[in-house]
Amino acid sequence: MSETAPAAPAAPAPVEKTPVKKKAKKTGAAAGKRKASGPPVSELITKAVAASKERSGVSLAALKKALAAAGYDVEKNNSRIKLGLKSLVSKGTLVQTKGTGASGSFKLNKKAASGEAKPKAKKAGAAKAKKPAGAAKKPKKATGAATPKKTAKKTPKKAKKPAAAAGAKKVSKSPKKVKAAKPKKAAKSPAKAKAPKAKASKPKASKPKATKAKKAAPRKK
């Protein structure tokens, strides 16, 4: 029985492990809050460079002072500041006037800043253009309602036109047949009348020839 008694203290061991897991969760949540709460380093650097009025540009030491004044931990995030400067220079948002790498002085690229402002203005213009387009859709519905009226009026007109055209065709065909038959008969009759006149003229020309021959015969005797 004495051997079974020491087995009981094994139960509090897992109880001690559970708070360790809770602490790990808390630290992870706190780290997430820290990351979400502060803006990225690149934004802070661009703001600090834009706020400076130096023509030659802002040095790294001046940047660190401006970031420390804004509440950013410069000592812990020194490497992040240098990486942020390099990335901004590679993107074209910052121009390095002096030095190489992260050490030197930096200025804002005016062309990149103006390029970022232009697309925003275009988006605003597109949003304004969309509003009148939506207002113009309302009168289109009214025109669509008016179209069936026009089609209803056109259908009886189409039915009347073929009937009138058929009547006109029938009327025009009947006088053409009457006119074509009359001149043909009239043309044939004068042709027949001219033929006997030509036959009558031929014997008249032959008669004087016979008389002349008879008169000449007694002279030969």
Swiss-Prot record:
Tree of life domain: Eukaryota
Residue positions, PTM N6-(beta-hydroxybutyryl)lysine: K33, K35, K53, K65, K86, K91, K107, K141
GO cellular component: euchromatin; nucleosome; nucleus
Residue numbers bearing the N6-acetyllysine modification: K17
UniProt feature, compositional bias: Low complexity: 1-17
GO molecular function: chromatin DNA binding; DNA binding; structural constituent of chromatin
CDD domains assigned: H15 (cd00073)
Localization annotation: Nucleus; Chromosome
PTM characteristics: H1 histones are progressively phosphorylated during the cell cycle, becoming maximally phosphorylated during late G2 phase and M phase, and being dephosphorylated sharply thereafter.
Single GO BP term: nucleosome assembly
Residue ranges of the region described as Disordered: 1-42, 92-221
Comment field on protein domains: The C-terminal domain is required for high-affinity binding to chromatin.
Family named by the database record: Belongs to the histone H1/H5 family.
Task performed by this protein: Histone H1 protein binds to linker DNA between nucleosomes forming the macromolecular structure known as the chromatin fiber. Histones H1 are necessary for the condensation of nucleosome chains into higher-order structured fibers. Also acts as a regulator of individual gene transcription through chromatin remodeling, nucleosome spacing and DNA methylation.
Protein's UniProt name: Histone H1.3
Organism (species): Mus musculus (Mouse)
